[in-house]
């Protein structure tokens, strides 16, 4: 039996509390910071120093003084942290946790799309690979996409990708006509209008709120649309006591933590398309987090020429959303 196998068996036999204690001890020993997305498991969020959306986590990665960044999210997030911090070690509990939305935009196809529209600038959702970021002019998140698009001169043609639903929402909000890449998040795209109407009838006192990665038919049923951080702020400040939440249900942990007296109902899915959970986010388990810190592996690396190209579009986002 190998040492690695022994360590995996040991980690599997530890309680959540014991693993959390070990993770905290390792964090101090390594001078590490743990960043986690709102869609990760509750115990991962408990272990994290900062839990946030893509923009908040990118800013945290840019500003940290830690020597090691441990990123519990999906691959493009850890990759973005490495792009911003080439001199730091960036670890990820499970590099196999990819993002199907990011994967829906292959480098060569996106390059051809750009070449077909040479006068357009490309504003690209952060849910994309480093190669796509290098091919882009400005990166955005769901928190700042509208704000960034509003800063572009009205005569300038815009390519927006890879999420068609977020792009359509930004078009509606800004009145801009953009060329949309036809990607989507499988979790958010699975919501349908008929089930939102049924949920509102079933819970008449609850307010429907939704993430802009949902389809337009769902968004028109919502009384508030926003990024994960915006949804959290809204529910925390709202006088309403119950909410139907149309986004990945991992966010309910933070909502309940911030507003313990309120009720949060996961929006229902079509039984014929019941993909309500981001299984990639859930690949970040507490034992994997512990083991990646013990082993200082898997480590995320980015080729320097790729990193430099991608950094320009990320920096442009951070400047435009400051």
Curated annotation (Swiss-Prot):
Q: Where are the transmembrane segments?
A: none
Its encoding gene is what? nadA
- Listed cofactors: [4Fe-4S] cluster
- In its UniProt entry, the species of origin is given as Chlorobaculum tepidum (strain ATCC 49652 / DSM 12025 / NBRC 103806 / TLS) (Chlorobium tepidum)
Binding positions for [4Fe-4S] cluster per the UniProt entry: 99, 185, 278
Q: Provide the alphabetized UniProt keywords.
A: 4Fe-4S, Cytoplasm, Iron, Iron-sulfur, Metal-binding, Pyridine nucleotide biosynthesis, Transferase
Tell me the route in metabolism or biology where this protein functions. Cofactor biosynthesis; NAD(+) biosynthesis; quinolinate from iminoaspartate: step 1/1
E.C. designation(s): 2.5.1.72
Please give the name of this protein: Quinolinate synthase
Q: GO MF annotations for this entry?
A: 4 iron, 4 sulfur cluster binding; metal ion binding; quinolinate synthetase A activity
Q: What does this protein do?
A: Catalyzes the condensation of iminoaspartate with dihydroxyacetone phosphate to form quinolinate.
What cellular component GO annotations does this protein have? cytosol
Class in the EC hierarchy, top level: transferase
Its subcellular locations are: Cytoplasm
- Organism domain of life: Bacteria
